[in-house]
Amino acid sequence: MRDILTLLKTATLTGLLVVNLSACTKITGSAFPDLTSNPAVTGVDVEKIAALESRMRQFVVEGDSMGIATLLVHDGKVASYTQAGVRDLLNGEPITQDSMYRIYSMSKPITGVAMMILHEQGAFSLDDPVSKFIPEFENLEVVKSYDLEGNVELEPLQRQPTIRELMSHTAGFGYGISGADPSNMQFRKKAVLASPDLQSLIDTVATIPLMHQPGTAWAYSVSVDLQGAIVERISGMSLGEFFQSKIFKPLGMVDTAFYVPAEKAERLADVFGYHPVTKNFQALPFAEPAFNILGDISYRKETRGMESGGGGLVSTMADYARFCQMMLNGGQLDGARILSKKTIDLMAKNVLTDSQTIDSTGNLTGTTSQRVGFGLNFGIIMGEASEISGYGDGSYFWGGAASTWFWIDSKNDLFFIGMVQQFPKPPPAVNPDFRKISQQFVYDALTD
């Protein structure tokens, strides 16, 4: 295997060359768009766009990332595209425009759109009880109290959780990716996220008490996988079939799916984990239990489990850009109407109370001085948070477990996507804040 620093520097220079061979590109047409950038796009400063791109490549040079691609689209045009580092470490293959990425929780907004397609068709009301479509949940219980000795007191539901609460992570379900409370501990013990199919997941979740009474708190949860089950039960289609028919095909998202076909396998980027012994990033899989919760990383059709609306998709920069542009356009792209603007606005409207706001990573419950809320399958940046950060008020965002991130800012007519394939270093190590750093450079570059 070639020297890692040589590989990374070569890949970084390759990415720089690709970026500089640029022409202004509009996100339009169903063909794979050329993502190379032209900072002469109106509304951005040329030198500051160059600084943004340099800083994104610096993540690789400094060893904070093995590979990265970032995209800034402003006024429907590519203002910046950067790629650096390796897609395939063993063979020294660099990140390319058509590299495929495990987007994990960036699947959640797509599932939210699927839900709202059905909502527009009149299939459900946001205030319908979840049990209307998942009757297995009619007799859920709730954790009332617990202690460190393992004693748990349960209580009945005061009322059924609603679809709106399911889409805003306030229904009370656990997830198992963190938390020492009884609900999350049972999610891990019963390996909920490793369920072979959605019915098995539902059957297991039905045996686990809620973390809190519906509507009383925000907690990141399995709720988007449950949304996927609702989409299947209402539509009579598998989640993958529904996505393909109602979202991917109309938008020209040709590479987004729950598995990677054999003919595309070489385009799937390595995913990296921080090795506890060697103290560096290594391509997975390796024997580290911390990553087992996420299951198969090859995304081969024959080894994939359930179609997870909460974290199961693989995509490309171009595909996810088309999804974001559709959202920014108010629900349509190139004549394909996916949702109404009214519905897009509803999804991007905060539904949390002041006591339920979350931090900008989407991982903490409780209040924050910076108003970051939650809509329907999106985090929402508003008020003081937007004033401090530079985001337009009402910008919405999310990210994925392997460090991918995006945000959509309708006030400034832009979106930004970052594609990385690595799981963060465990504490006490410090991880780069990709989102915050990119945000600072993006808003510094705006001139309009």
Predicted stretch roles:
Residues 40-103, 123-125, 142-146, 427, ...:
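Short, conserved catalytic-motif segment at the N-terminal edge
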Residues 30-40:
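Acidic/histidine-rich, surface-exposed loop or edge segments in extracytoplasmic proteins
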Residues 2-12:
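Bacterial N-terminal signal peptides that target proteins for export
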Residues 22-23:
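C-terminal motif of bacterial Sec signal peptides marking the signal peptidase cleavage site
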Residues 50-57, 76, 101-134, 138, ...:
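Active-site SXXK
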Residues 395, 402-415:
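Short, surface-exposed beta-strand/loop micro-motifs that present aromatic residues
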Residues 140-390:
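Short, surface-exposed loop or secondary-structure junction motifs
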